[in-house]
Regions:
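Active-site nucleophile elbow and catalytic-triad environment of alpha/beta-hydrolase enzymes
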Residues: 194-210, 225
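Short beta-strand/loop motif that positions the catalytic acidic residue
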Residues: 214, 220-222
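Conserved alpha/beta-hydrolase "acid-adjacent" motif
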Residues: 227-234
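Conserved acidic catalytic loop of the alpha/beta-hydrolase fold
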Residues: 90-115
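Conserved alpha/beta-hydrolase
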Residues: 60-79
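The serine-hydrolase catalytic nucleophile loop
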Residues: 44-57
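Catalytic histidine-centered segment of alpha/beta-hydrolase-like enzymes
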Residues: 254-264
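Flexible "cap/lid" loop of the alpha/beta hydrolase fold
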Residues: 127-135, 140-170
Length: 279
């Protein structure tokens, strides 16, 4: 599928991959001549909810940045593959890489500010972005990670309890599982069984940020009231030990749900990706 509307957006699905990821290419009215920005949303969200409705796409377009958005498998307008492999984090990262190249991203070249790729992730998207940045050193220029964590909460998700709840309404004892499942059920665009497949695939590929650490400059952001805020200095230490230059930003009064809507977050990210000093 393809089309254009506000913000000069082109949309299509990724050809030749099972997930049929829904991709949006958003063109700025005045191009700043900088590398494109890939946005990766969180669990049970979508590019529209995570990035468009919250003003991220418009903020980046106003800064002259070309923006690439992707709906993860089973989310938003992407397909819901039946095979488990399509939901594995490693497969998703491979599909994101293909998406970036299809959108015109190319390896970093010294002295060429339009080469390479900047990546912004939120929640689950931060996990994917961290691993993507660690494995794609010739492509990724800078990272912005919102609501990141030292461990993936989905790894502790109680799949059996979730399946029982969906089958007959049996109460879920684990609070995190109950919260994540109910959040996923709120969005009609989500394929709940596809999302459970994603959880199962994530359990099969445990997240260990120390195993592969990005060497690029990164901005780590969390809401003050988000329990994941405690992960920021730990991730920063990992990044620093790998030779990165991490910066941290804590958003006063914000939690994991509403941090992504923060104007201060967007402004800091736009400046950071452009290599500018904090305002």
């Amino acid at each position: 599928m393809s089309g254009r509307h506000t913000g000069q957006q082109q949309t299509h699905t990724v050809e030749g991959t099972d997930p049929q990821l829904y991709v949006g290419i958003h063109e700025p009215a005045a191009d700043a001549g900088l590398r494109p920005v890939l946005l990766i949303h969180g669990f049970s969200s979508s590019s529209k909810l995570n990035w468009e409705d919250t003003g991220w796409i418009s903020a980046l377009l106003e800064a002259g940045r070309r923006v690439i958005t992707v709906d993860l498998p089973g989310h938003g307008r992407s397909g819901a593959p039946e095979d488990m492999d399509s939901y594995s984090p490693s497969r998703i990262r491979a599909d994101l890489l293909q998406t970036a190249f299809d959108a015109g991203a190319r390896p970093l070249q010294d002295g060429d500010p339009s080469s390479g790729l900047d990546v912004v992730g939120y929640s689950l998207g931060s996990r994917l972005a961290w691993e993507f940045g660690a494995t794609q050193r010739e492509l990724v220029h800078r990272l912005v990670l919102g609501g990141p964590n030292m461990a993936d909460p989905l790894a502790e998700f109680d799949l059996v309890a979730a399946q029982r709840y969906l089958a007959d309404g049996t109460r879920i004892e684990d609070e995190s599982t109950e919260r994540l499942l109910k959040m996923a059920l709120l969005l009609p665009s989500n394929n709940i069984f596809a999302l459970l497949s994603l959880v199962e695939a994530i359990k099969a590929e445990p997240y260990d940020p120390a195993e592969a650490v990005p060497h690029v400059p990164m901005l780590l952001v969390s809401g003050e009231k988000d329990e994941r805020v405690e992960s920021l200095p730990l991730l920063a230490d990992l990044a620093r030990s790998a030779g990165s230059m991490p910066e941290q930003l804590v958003l006063p009064g914000r939690n994991h749900t509403n941090a992504v809507t923060s104007r201060a977050f967007k402004q800091a990210a736009v400046r950071f990706l452009a290599g500018q000093e904090p305002a």
